[in-house]
Amino acid sequence: MRARKPLNWLKQPSGCWPTSSAGSGTRVFKNVFNRATSDSVVRDFRILRSRIILFVTVFLSVLLAANWFVCATWNHFLRMTEMPVWEIIFPGLTLAFVAATLLGRRYSSFGLRLLYRISAVWLGVLNFSFFASCAAWIISAAAALLPVHFEPKIIAEAFFGLAIFTGIYGFVNANRLKIVHVTVNLTNLPIAWRGRTVALVTDLHLGSVRRARFANRVVAKIQCLQPDAVFISGDLFDGPEANPDTLVEPWRKLSAPAGIFYVTGNHEEFGDRAELIDAVQRSGIHVLNNEKVDVHGLQIVGVHDREAGDPRQFRALLQQAELDGSRTSILLAHQPSNLPIAEEMGISLQLSGHTHGGQIWPWTWAATRVHGRFTYGLNRFGNLLVYTSSGAGTWGVPMRVGTKSEIVLIRLADGKGELINYH
């Protein structure tokens, strides 16, 4: 454990320390979402509900089709003459996942969480089994053209065995928290922040799968890093939670000289955002409610995901922040989107998450089609630097293949906004 640097730089007159209310060192944006009329709120709710219904319908249809294909492949290659039990169990687990997800929005119990975990694991195995089925059919067809005989059953067993092994690896890999070290040059970085470190953690998804025990692990690792500030860029929760205070209780143990800052992600929108925010605030974390705070010359800006996702609201909020373009600014925004606006408004560094890096193969490829090079890691958009974390937790399938669960320790240095070191 490294020795902490002297903290004389933090000894400032009363009023300079960031607070949740407007005052010295803090500028609260004129909350655009608070001015929304009741009609617009109802309209937004209806749009969200329609999107959820459409997503669930398409999602369930695709999963049931994948189940049918996997079961049909097993039956063919294993030469089953009677209906095997997996033709009931596998689709049942798929339906159980959707049911547990929807019921979890209203109820919280150990049994429901257990059902969610078991069915979520099956979805991961189903993902790899689907591609194993495709491979089995292709290899079997190719083998038929060769002079050497290959037993189709052995081919299928080999691929399905590989699918199960990959699922086990993905489950173990998802539970290994790695520390990623990044050193970033930021133009006009205040002297007080040069050489200081900040920890970035996103996408814990505390809820059905990951509970307070996981939060304790994350907090312990961050505490060992001794960062000068901690940034939580959304999806701290997985959705609605009956007792959010239990999940955020471990954060009371964490301290950082310059503060711990948080903005919401899209999953907080699935629950009562105000209730979740209140729980986070009670834990001692500074919730950036669409506001800018000045911490020893560094402008720290936070925009919640709902507002950051709307280009007009996002632009309006950043304009209201009245950023000083001659000074360094860090933006917490859950998704690496609307980057042209952030760059135009003079943001120096944006810290995001959301993508999970794609989480499991082959969706790692799909994620890059959506977010491009901003799917993961440190990248540049004009004068804006963007770090997108793959997150500490998982959503849905509790597995990671081709990605890692991470906490990012960023060392700040004064310079031209270029990447120095990344490992």
For each feature predicted by the language model, list its residue ranges:
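Long, contiguous hydrophobic alpha-helical segments, chiefly transmembrane helices and signal peptides
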Residues: A120-S133, L177, A215, V303, ...
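N-terminal signal-anchor transmembrane helix
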Residues: L112-Y116, L145-L162, G170-L200, G207-C224
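Soluble catalytic domains of enzymes that build or remodel membrane lipids, polysaccharides, and related
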Residues: N185-H423
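A broad, low-specificity signal marking well-ordered, structured residues that form hydrophobic/aromatic
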Residues: V42, T166, V182, L298, ...
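Catalytic cores of secreted/periplasmic lytic hydrolases that degrade extracellular macromolecules
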Residues: P6
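Non-catalytic terminal accessory segments
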Residues: M1, G15-P18, G23-N175, G417-N421
